[in-house]
């Protein structure tokens, strides 16, 4: 694939427009227009505190879906597509066509609906090229079936750092921002000089801090450098979160700005040096339990949202490696 030219960044544009959709308790979408044609819908999954996005070029109606959720009941071992179906309904409402089904990384706290969305809506599944590292580590941990490829081929496109792509007429760029996992990517999208970055699990809202760094292949020092790269964008750049944990019981928030993160992020505001951050992050990570859904999530997500291959009885099974995490 040819790489798109890196878009220019202009700062003399009016502020973003944002408004909340009206609806019942299950209508948690938020809508934002950035620049002239960058439309962002945010969908909050209360069960996993995950925020999924529909990002659309209003001119061409072409869109990308970012970090979707496949609902999973660990007690019953059952999946459900209710969260993903909300995305499908919104795509239909907007009369949009799906170009991309993007994953910022192999999530450890929710299952991805990428395979289901591609089946229903089309589009190309994409993730960072370092997915192969994650597949090798977790393919071994779960003793994956011989047919499980560790080359990222479950995804349609493996994005390299600084690789450009388009969503309709919108310029987008992949940024390798490892630390939480070795394969984490952020997605920068620009329109009319306004910049939006979908940061995955690097930063959280300023009152919650940063992502953990105790998974295989994770590294706190690497995360610090990735975050500083994100915070090098202009002050007014919008940063879109992948999770919000509602500290103190506040309302859900799904975006912040570079300026707000620099000024008040409790873990990595301006003035916190690399060694201090690493010491804090490593000490904090020692106190954290594993995510409730890490074992099912990783097995599904390293396969681009597909369940493990069915066994001879036609049933897919998830494994529990004992005493390994």
Regions found by a protein language model. Name each.
Residues 63, 70-171, 194-195, 264:
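Active-site HxH/HxHxD metal-binding segment of metal-dependent hydrolases
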């Amino acid at each position: 694939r040819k790489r798109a030219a890196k878009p220019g960044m202009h700062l003399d544009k009016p502020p973003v427009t944002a408004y909340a959709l009206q609806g019942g308790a299950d209508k948690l979408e938020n809508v934002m227009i950035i620049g002239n044609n960058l439309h962002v819908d945010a969908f909050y999954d209360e069960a996993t505190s995950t925020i999924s996005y529909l990002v659309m070029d209003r001119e061409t109606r072409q869109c990308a879906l970012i970090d979707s959720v496949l609902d999973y009941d660990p007690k019953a071992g059952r999946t459900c597509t209710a969260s993903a179906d909300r995305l499908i309904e919104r795509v239909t409402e907007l009369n949009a066509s799906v170009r991309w089904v993007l994953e910022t990384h192999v999530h450890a706290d929710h299952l991805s609906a990428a395979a289901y969305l591609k089946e229903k809506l089309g589009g190309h599944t994409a993730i960072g090229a370092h997915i192969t590292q994650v597949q090798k580590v977790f393919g071994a941990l779960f003793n994956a079936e011989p047919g499980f490829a560790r080359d990222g081929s479950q995804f349609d496109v493996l994005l390299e750092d600084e690789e450009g792509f388009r969503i309709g007429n919108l310029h987008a760029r992949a940024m390798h921002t490892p630390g939480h996992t070795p394969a984490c990517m952020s997605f920068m999208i620009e329109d009319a000089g306004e910049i939006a970055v979908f940061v995955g699990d690097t930063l959280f809202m300023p009152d919650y801090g940063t992502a953990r760094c105790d998974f295989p292949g994770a590294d706190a020092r690497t995360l610090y450098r990735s975050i500083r790269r994100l915070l090098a964008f202009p002050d007014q750049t919008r940063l879109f979160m992948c999770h919000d944990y509602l500290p103190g019981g506040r309302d859900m928030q799904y975006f912040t700005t570079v300026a707000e993160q620099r000024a008040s992020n409790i873990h990595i505001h301006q003035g916190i040096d690399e060694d201090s951050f690493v010491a804090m992050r490593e000490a904090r990570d020692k106190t954290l339990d594993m995510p409730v859904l890490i074992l099912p999530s990783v097995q599904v997500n390293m396969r681009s949202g597909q369940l493990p291959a069915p066994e001879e009885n036609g049933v897919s099974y998830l494994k529990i490696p004992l005493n390994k995490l």
